[in-house]
């Protein structure tokens, strides 16, 4: 208690906590922007990469394990990112969302570019022969090769979408 017996009023939260810094709209309006459309494409194409690599039975786990990790992780984080904007939580969480958007898309772009290169390298090993105890057989059969070609194409398209999102995020972060 103060000397006068009155309790000081609590601080105004609007003064204590600055408003979040975000230039993208929250709620369903995010889907009407280029960034929202790219995030939706990233989710769909990244899911296809994940499904295609998994359906090839991962014949080269050293190379394709990283591709699976990146595609699954990026898929779920992109869903979380889109969910935060669709639910409007970005307006209630004090953060520089423009900077976080840029950092997220930069990291995922770098990782997805590496995953694309590894998937392309795994696909290029189609004609490589593998010695077993009885016979010599190709490392990838024709079905696995076709699936890996499709996964490589979709990994490239997903990488391009993350690159476009990175460019848009850079423009928002540094106008």
Curated annotation (Swiss-Prot):
InterPro entries: MAL, Marvel, MARVEL-CKLF_proteins. Glycans are attached at residue 131. Residues 55-65, 123-148 are lumenal. One of its GO terms (cellular component) is membrane raft. It is found in: Cell membrane; Apical cell membrane. Residues 30-174 form the MARVEL domain. The chain crosses the membrane at residues 34-54, 66-86, 102-122, 149-169. Member of the machinery of polarized transport. Required for the indirect transcytotic route at the step of the egress of the transcytosing cargo from perinuclear endosomes in order for it to travel to the apical surface via a raft-dependent pathway. This is Protein MAL2.
């Amino acid at each position: 208690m103060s000397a006068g017996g009155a309790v000081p009023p609590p601080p105004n939260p609007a003064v204590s906590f600055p408003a979040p810094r975000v230039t993208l709209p929250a709620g369903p309006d995010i889907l009407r922007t280029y960034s929202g459309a790219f995030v939706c494409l990233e989710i769909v194409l990244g899911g296809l990469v994940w499904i295609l690599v998994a359906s090839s039975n991962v014949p080269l786990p050293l190379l394709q394990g990283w591709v699976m990790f990146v595609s699954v992780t990026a898929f779920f984080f992109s869903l979380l990112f889109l969910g935060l904007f669709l639910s409007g939580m970005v307006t209630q969480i004090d953060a520089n969302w423009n900077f976080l958007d840029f950092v997220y898309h930069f990291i995922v772009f770098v990782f997805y570019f590496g995953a694309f290169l590894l998937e392309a390298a795994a696909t290029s090993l189609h004609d490589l022969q593998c010695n077993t105890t009885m016979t010599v057989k190709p490392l990838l059969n024709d079905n696995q090769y076709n699936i890996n070609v499709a996964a490589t194409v979709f990994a490239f398209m997903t990488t391009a979408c993350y690159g476009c999102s990175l460019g848009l995020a850079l423009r928002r972060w540094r106008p």
